[in-house]
Swiss-Prot record:
The gene is LYS2. SMART domains: PKS_PP, PKS_PP_betabranch. This is L-2-aminoadipate reductase large subunit. Pathway: Amino-acid biosynthesis; L-lysine biosynthesis via AAA pathway; L-lysine from L-alpha-aminoadipate (fungal route): step 1/3. Binds 1 phosphopantetheine covalently. The keyword Ligase does not apply. Belongs to the ATP-dependent AMP-binding enzyme family. GO terms for biological process: lysine biosynthetic process via aminoadipic acid. The modification O-(pantetheine 4'-phosphoryl)serine is found at residue 865.
């Protein structure tokens, strides 16, 4: 392997550093820190292994790239479960391989790569080193090192050589201690898993949070509404709220503490007297202003829980919030307008309101009106005015719920977070002291009115006795106006989201020097955001507060000093502000992802948990999610703090659950800085995959924000017009910069009202410049496919970027762009072959890009996998070259694709991948066998029901349950009613949480007509990543699974007929090994694998089948060792199933028991045809109707109804046919049908189809699809059907004695004999056609045929779902 191949697209790991990377000379200032490690004794390989371990721990990068001794570069993949010994062995293997490779001049290599790839500058190849010779960080101009180790081989001394412009001395000192600590530990015990060795040094113990510390669990300071009432009685005439006037008015509305207190007392007494009880939810339909504060205080004084609906939300969305909240009371603020009729209807039908204030408004004189109800005359609040000075006397405690706030949830359903009174007031005294807040401050009401930060806006001044200023909507929404408002009214403290901060500074010129603190919440805060704000507010300290709705007021903080105090403070910081450290009695615990009993050391990436007494109570109505996200602190024993309140006597004691040491699992990744602050490193789930590449959205946005003409930006994953995922950046440029005019062209006046079209056309030169800018910083696959320039980013009512409004452009918009754009092409960039390919691509692409270069990818230019099929055929026809469809996936850029076309034309043959690939899958399987356990606990079959003693629960772990076959497997199991036996399914699902996982199962079952709601009682959803060790589950969850499960059915797979083995390996092979590992631990388990007859698709088995048939035998025996296809399989899918089977057989020799079940084509349900419409055979039916022709192919088809396949799978899993062995179970059709006869059944039911010679049929199809661009269901599969379908549809005959054995034993479990099997009779095909016609997949027959379509039963809901495309998912098995 050449150095170019070794260093293709390397991961440039970034060791956490303290200072911004310099962008001008000098780039490097070398520093050295030396330590002595006597135990090391000059052992370079051990030091390299330790350095690699630390690199993985601090970056999380599994692609390790290190500059090593002898002027070489080491590159390999690391996994977190390795012991240190295994890591050493892996590195020794790599070093041994490198020993035979000559070093090179890496600057020359960078320059060569630059030239080959047309890059603007030579690429950097590595950043981190471990050597034995003298280390110079700047040895290579194009690959300067950030940090490295130098081992002095003649001694035990090690030097850390580092760039002092990046790393602080404190960090290097801690790193030296961590290296010493790690080596000391692993040299004493090399069998430790390297990710579980503690990195907390003695020197860092004092700066990191102690997870066992007492965080004042019993420190309740009282309820915010009581504190407010006390303040109102102390200083009743002090100004409380100021509503500033709109632009066309001079009328300011000012309200005192007495006004607010009395008005809210009236509201509270009304609520209580109309039936609101302690803990009831009262929903407020609100506007921004004093009325909201009155309503909130009134609800709290009544002992109830307030929640807010913003009228800016669509009515349908409002009903969703109401459905989650289930309020007992409703208050409509007059200024918010009337409820939409849709909302009123929902309230009438779905809610049980006991109290309603129809139109509340506080008057200028402080009196309050509530409006009148239809059933009553007069104002609803009028009779309660006499109670305006009377407290309600309702007692609530620290664990009562004052707030219900919403946060995003799965399937578009928000989650309601119940707050606690403990948190609302606890932190204000500390904040006042820490940030110099007082009764003299003027706060602002800028947060979204339905967003939980609005609580800070209101409660902070009420606690302090300060003032709250309220702007108009015009003040907020007009660029530049909000800054004027801040300056005019002398506001001193504000709470903002970063998006609202950008709105405050956008086009602003008016300074507001009286602002001394701005608290930011809700999103990442960048240096750019801070600089813009402090340019206008030089006396403003900026506080970045990290927390979530679920942590309530319990947050961390990082303070940015004001410009007037330290003009250079921001210059020293990196681009994203750190989260900082916890406020009073709040901890950010960064927990080791591989051993949650450990807090991470400085620099180490882990998952952030928030520990505090002020966490929210949890999610309303979601107990399972609460268990997952709000967890008891495992660092102390449960009940450890109970002694603290044993003598507590308080009137609110009954509303107090006692000291609870809980953690909130944020899902964010973070690391500690050398001073103990914490910085966020992205989401544990914020990485997306597009075309197989792992992409970090935050990294893309950070790089885009560094372009000098970018003001705001956000990158999202969006589905393009064909439903494929792509990256789209939405961006607001620096309109105030004159240089922007150089990157702008005129937009036709007839389309100037569409901002998306205007942005795509008018700023196309700018987006081209930005893409060129990104090519220097990002891998090609991470560059957004589309960059859309907008005048501003839309904000939701909460002040955050409104992501749902940022969508992929419509067909009409893209057509307008294409019609009014010229393509910017520099012809000199392309060679002759590249020009040909470029022009052919442009013919195929649905919309023309504004610019194109040799490095552009087909997919980034707007192509997709279906379009790729058409493009490949066009290239084959026009350039007369034989081209496999997979070429475009392997060579996606114009440059690479053209080079491959040139190679094929010159050699006149397709690249001989088959031998390499076939060798790969067999040898890869052999190597993976070495990773298996030496033995598996021997499981025994359940036996017959009559043999089972007493009531028994059979626990079955099933994968692929949301797929076609998986839905039927699930229903087959749960439909069994055997006395004394209960089945429980542990269903693996990919989802955000268990609730959304169950929703996915329910929806899939509904689509395929199998779901019954009672199934939910017998289901346990398992959320995990099958490609990771232990599915990425915690040790506790994994242990519970391994000790509980009796039977495993691994049915999940990635089915793709184009992807090569390498792309399917993780999903179909590695995942299988990880699931087998479940069988190796805990209780003995039967392991059952749903494979595919595609493992038999070689000439060997076709010939063997013919030979066996001629001698009177059934077909390929189930006992065959499958070595006849160890070479020769041509589909990546078949290869991946073969590899998995081969590994499972090896495990069987080590004690694994169970079955390998091999279905062929899995077709619709026998009784009503319910089908997965994205199916080869069903597409062929539709294509035949569209084309009017069917090919004359006489192969038999092994197609079996899905309910029969599911029965065989479950029967073999419960009743393994080979007892104490592991064997194969064939699913064979009885009877089989000839391919053309299957299709010709259409004729019998009134469809116009004729049989045509296969070669003529191919020509007819190609002309229709390629030349006339007619729709055809086979379009995505043209590469297959226009190849050699006569060969590819061959299916060897199969012996299925094992299947019959299991089905016979299964009769006692089901009271049904399925041993005769099922297949494809003409009657069965009629049921399929009837189903497809009823869901709209096939048109209604044009005339009466010889047969009438049979009547079938399917629900209207199923019809709607299938018709909408929900049934067109890939099968879990094929």
């Amino acid at each position: 392997m050449s150095w170019k191949e070794r260093l293709d697209n390397p991961t440039l790991s970034v060791w956490p550093h303290d200072y911004l990377r310099p962008h001008a000379e000098p780039f490097v200032e070398q520093g050295t820190y030396s330590i002595s490690i006597p135990q090391l004794s000059g052992d370079y390989a051990t030091l390299l292994a330790a350095w690699t371990a630390l690199l993985y721990r601090v970056t999380g990068d599994d692609d390790i790239v290190l500059y090593v001794r002898d002027n070489k570069v080491l590159r390999f993949t690391i996994t977190p479960e390795l012991t240190f010994t295994q890591l050493q062995n892996k590195i020794n293997e790599q070093l041994a391989e490198l020993a035979n490779v000559e070093g090179t001049n890496f600057d020359a290599l960078s320059e060569s790569l630059q030239k080959e790839s047309g890059l603007e500058r030579p690429p950097q190849l590595f950043r981190i080193a471990c050597v034995t010779e003298d280390l110079q960080l700047d040895r290579y101009t194009h690959s300067p090192l950030d940090i490295g180790l130098q081992l002095h081989e003649s001694s035990s001394d090690v030097s850390i050589v580092f760039n002092k412009l990046l790393f602080s001395q404190d960090r290097i000192t801690i790193l030296a201690d961590q290296l010493t600590l790690f080596l000391t530990s692993v040299l004493q015990n090399a069998k430790q898993v390297f990710t579980k060795v503690s990195l907390i040094t003695d020197s860092s113990t004092s700066i990191l949070p102690d997870p066992k510390a007492n965080l004042d669990w019993c420190g309740f300071v009282g309820c915010i509404h009581d504190i407010f009432q006390d303040n109102a009685e102390k200083f009743p005439e002090r100004t409380c709220v100021v509503e500033t006037p709109p632009i066309n008015s001079t009328k300011t509305r000012t309200f005192t503490y007495k006004d607010i207190n009395e008005a809210s007392n009236i509201v509270a007494h009304y609520l209580i007297n109309t039936g609101i009880k302690r803990g009831d939810v009262v929903m407020i339909y609100s506007s921004r202003g004093v009325d909201l504060m009155v309503c909130v205080m009134g609800v709290l004084k009544a002992g109830a829980t307030f929640s807010v609906i913003d009228p800016a939300y669509p009515p349908a969305r409002q009903t969703i919030y109401l459905g989650v909240a289930k309020p007992k009371g409703l208050i409509v603020i007059r200024a918010a307008g009337q409820l939409d009729q849709l909302v009123e209807d929902y309230i009438t039908k779905e809610l049980d309101l006991v109290s309603r204030i129809p139109s509340i408004a506080i008057q200028d004189n402080g009196t309050v009106e509530g409006g009148s109800l239809p059933s009553e005359s007069g104002d609803v609040l009028a009779s309660y005015t006499e109670l305006k000075s009377t407290r309600t006397g309702v007692v609530v405690g620290p664990d009562s719920n004052p707030t219900l706030s919403f946060t995003s949830g799965s399937e578009g359903i928000p989650k309601g977070v119940l707050g606690r009174h403990f948190s609302l007031a606890y932190y204000f005294s500390w904040m006042a002291k820490q940030f110099n807040l007082s009764e003299n401050d003027k706060f602002t009401m800028l947060s979204g009115i339905a967003h939980d930060p609005i609580q800070r806006d209101m409660f902070t001044p009420l606690f302090l006795g300060a003032q709250l200023y309220v702007p108009t909507q015009d003040d907020i929404g007009t660029p530049g106006r909000l800054a004027e408002w801040m300056g005019k009214y002398g506001c001193t403290v504000t709470h903002l989201t970063p998006a609202m901060g950008q709105l405050l500074t956008a086009q602003a010129v008016t300074p507001f020097p009286k602002l001394h603190h701005a608290f930011f919440v809700g999103d990442i805060l960048t240096k750019r955001d801070c600089l813009r704000l402090q340019t206008l507010a030089e006396n403003c300290c900026i506080v970045n507060m990290y927390g979530t709705t679920e942590t309530q007021r319990a947050v961390s903080y990082f303070e940015v000093t004001s410009r007037s105090q330290d003009p250079h403070f921001l210059k020293k910081l990196k681009d994203v502000m750190p989260a900082g450290r916890g406020m009073k009695n709040v901890q950010l615990l960064v927990v080791n992802r591989n051993d949650r009993t450990q807090v991470c050391g400085v620099g180490e990436i882990g998952e952030i948990y928030v520990r505090a007494g002020g966490l929210a109570e949890g999610y309303r109505g979601l107990p399972d999610l609460n268990k997952e996200k709000f967890v008891n602190n495992w660092f102390v024993e449960e009940g450890h703090w109970n002694y603290l309140d044993k003598d507590l006597e308080a009137p609110w004691k009954e509303f107090w659950q006692g000291p609870r040491d809980r953690l909130y699992r944020t899902g964010d990744l973070g690391r500690y800085l050398p001073n103990g602050d914490c910085e966020c490193c992205g989401r544990a789930d914020d990485q997306v995959k597009i075309r197989g590449f792992r992409i970090e959205l935050g990294e893309i946005d950070t790089n885009i924000s560094q372009h000098p003409l970018v003001r705001e930006n956000i990158t999202l994953v969006r589905n393009n017009l064909e439903g494929e995922k792509c990256l789209v950046t939405y961006m607001v440029p620096r309109f105030d910069k004159p240089e922007l005019e150089n990157f702008k062209i005129e937009v036709p006046s007839n389309i100037s009202d569409d901002p998306v079209v205007c942005g795509l056309i008018g700023y196309s030169p700018f987006t081209k410049d930005l893409k060129a800018f990104l090519k220097k910083r990002l891998a090609s696959y991470a560059i957004p496919s589309l960059i859309i320039v907008l005048p501003k980013l839309p904000l939701n009512p909460n002040g955050k970027v409104d992501k749902p409004k940022l969508q992929f452009p419509t067909v009409k918009q893209l057509e307008l762009v294409a019609k009014n754009s010229s393509i910017d092409i520099n012809d000199s960039e392309f060679n002759q072959q590249e020009r040909e390919i470029r022009d052919l691509w442009l013919e195929c692409l649905p919309t023309k890009p504004t610019s194109i270069s040799p490095e552009d990818s087909f997919f980034d230019l707007g192509g997709h996998s279906i379009l790729a099929t058409k493009m490949i055929f066009t290239v084959k026809k026009q350039l007369n070259v034989e081209l496999p469809l997979g070429t475009i996936f392997k060579y996606p850029t114009i440059k690479a694709f053209a080079a491959e076309v040139s190679r094929l034309k010159s050699t006149d043959k397709i690249e001989e991948e088959t031998t390499a690939l076939t060798a790969d899958y067999a040898s890869d399987a052999a190597s993976l066998i070495d990773t298996l356990p030496k033995s598996y606990p021997a499981a025994r079959a359940l036996g017959s029901p009559s043999e089972m003693a007493g009531p028994t629960t059979v626990n079955i772990f099933v994968t692929g349950v949301t797929g076609f076959l998986g839905s039927f497997i699930l229903s087959d199991i749960l439909n069994r009613t055997v006395t004394g036996v209960n089945f429980k399914i542990f269903a693996h699902v990919r989802a955000a949480d268990e609730t959304s996982g169950l929703d996915r199962i329910r929806k899939a079952g509904t689509v395929y007509g199998t779901w019954k709601e009672e199934y939910a009682n017998s289901l346990q959803v398992v959320i995990g990543d099958l490609s990771k060790k232990n599915f990425g589950l915690t040790d506790d969850k994994w242990s519970h699974l391994s000790e509980t499960i009796d039977i495993i059915i691994h049915n999940g797979a990635l089915v793709h007929w184009v992807y090569p083995y390498s792309k399917l390996r993780n999903a179909n092979v590695v995942s299988t090994i990880n699931i087998m590992n479940l069988a190796s631990e805990g209780k003995p388990k039967l392991f059952n694998f749903v494979s595919s007859t595609s493992v038999l698709d070689t000439n060997h088995y076709f010939e063997l089948s013919d030979k066996l048939q001629q001698s009177g035998k059934e077909g390929i025996p189930e006992s065959d060792d499958l070595m006849g296809s160890s070479l020769g399989l041509t589909s990546g899918y078949g290869q991946s199933k073969w590899a998995a089977e081969h590994i499972i057989r090896a495990a069987g020799k080590r004690g694994l028991r169970g079955s390998i079940i091999r279905p062929g084509y899995v077709t619709g349900a026998s009784y009503n045809g319910s089908s997965n419409t994205d199916d080869f055979l069903l597409r062929f039916l539709k294509s035949a109707v569209q084309l009017g022709k069917i090919p004359d192919i006489n192969n038999t088809v092994n197609m079996v109804p899905v309910d029969q396949v599911a029965r065989v799978v479950v029967a073999a899993s419960i009743n393994p046919p080979c007892g104490d062995d592991l064997c194969v179970v064939h699913v064979n059709a009885h009877p089989r049908i000839i391919f053309k006869d299957y299709l010709y059944e259409l004729k019998n039911y009134g469809y116009d189809v004729e049989i045509e010679n296969y070669e003529q049929w191919k020509k007819t199809l190609e002309e229709a699809v390629i030349e006339r661009s007619e729709d055809n269901a086979l379009f995505p599969l043209l590469h297959m059907v226009l190849g050699d379908l006569e060969d590819s549809t061959k299916a060897p005959e199969l012996d299925d004695k094992n299947a019959i054995t299991s089905l016979r034993a299964d009769i006692e479990w089901t009271n049904e004999d399925r041993t005769k099997g099922m297949g494809a009779t003409p009657e069965q095909i009629g049921i399929y056609i009837s189903f497809l016609e009823s869901v709209g997949f096939l048109p209604h027959p044009k005339h009466f045929g010889d047969k009438a379509l049979p009547n079938i039963k399917i629900s209207e809901q199923q019809k709607e779902l299938v018709a909408s495309g929900a049934g067109a998912r890939s099968s879990s098995a094929a």
